[in-house]
Amino acid sequence: MFLNSIAHYLPSIEISNDYFLEKNGLTDEWIYTRTGIKTRRKASPDENANTMAVEAVKHLLEISKSPIEDVDLIIGGTYTPFDTVGTLAHVVQEHFNVSDVMAISVSTACSSLINALEIVEGYFAMNKAKKALVVVSEHNTGYSVDSDEFAGHLWGDGAAAMFVSKERTADDDMEFIEIITQGLANVGKGTIGVGLQPLKEGIKMRYGKDVFVHACNYMTKITNEILTKNGFKIADLDYLIPHQANIRIINNVAEQLGISQEKTIVNIERLGNTGCVSTAIGLSENLDKVKKGKLFCLTVFGGGYSSGAALLKTNH
């Protein structure tokens, strides 16, 4: 399975930490030292997870050699949907008039991208598809509560899209060596560590310490697992693209793995926690740099709990 191309979309509205002083009493210094976040992007009133997904696909088509007509599978991922019936994947299918293909949306919180890719892998293995469009989008600010001093300041919005094929389509395609996912609902605070109950309240981080501990442990564990399983060592890894939940989590994982800051892709300072989109944006923004290496890994942890990793190699 190969990653052919990737692109992302960020809303134009930028929210600095100063905004939250009036909302939840937290200063810029307090937020930055504890999260690593300085600014984040916020969707405009006429934007949502679906519209941002469409914009990400538009950007993808601008830079890709693949026509949308080649797609025979669309997988969408989000935990902040605009519509739970007319889902992200269906809206993308409609907007770009992609006929007679399967369109599926998935949610495993911040792990949704890796699960979406694993679903693609399954369709390819069953010979039910050859070319997939994977789209992830998060409208976190539509669900977050700015006055929440525990989590209101964490979230940012954005979307990303990628073409994935069963066979290599170009010399610069990146090959998926393996994808691993894991449900962790029975670990720690599992299903209640982070919550979003639309009929009741917005995004809540009820057990932040529990999330922190398990995110550090499982992102480290699954990264080691995917490398070892495929005969690689940490020293072989050129770049790590971790979920952008908190700079302390990112630094902890990198330290446990023994990976330098130079090899760790970070965008949380500018974008906040963009949920399941964060690693896709990290790859999209740093694609030229990543392609100069040989081996890189996406590693994630999500509410629920869940974790996942994808190991890829370039064509060097």
What would you call each of these model-derived segments?
Residues 24-33, 83-97, 130-140, 193-196, ...:
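Acidic-glycine-rich active-site phosphate/pyrophosphate-binding loop
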Residues 3, 31, 60, 71-74, ...:
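Buried hydrophobic positions in well-ordered alpha/beta secondary-structure cores of metabolic enzymes
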Residues 1-45, 148-213, 217, 221, ...:
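Condensing-enzyme catalytic core mediating Claisen C-C bond formation in acyl metabolism
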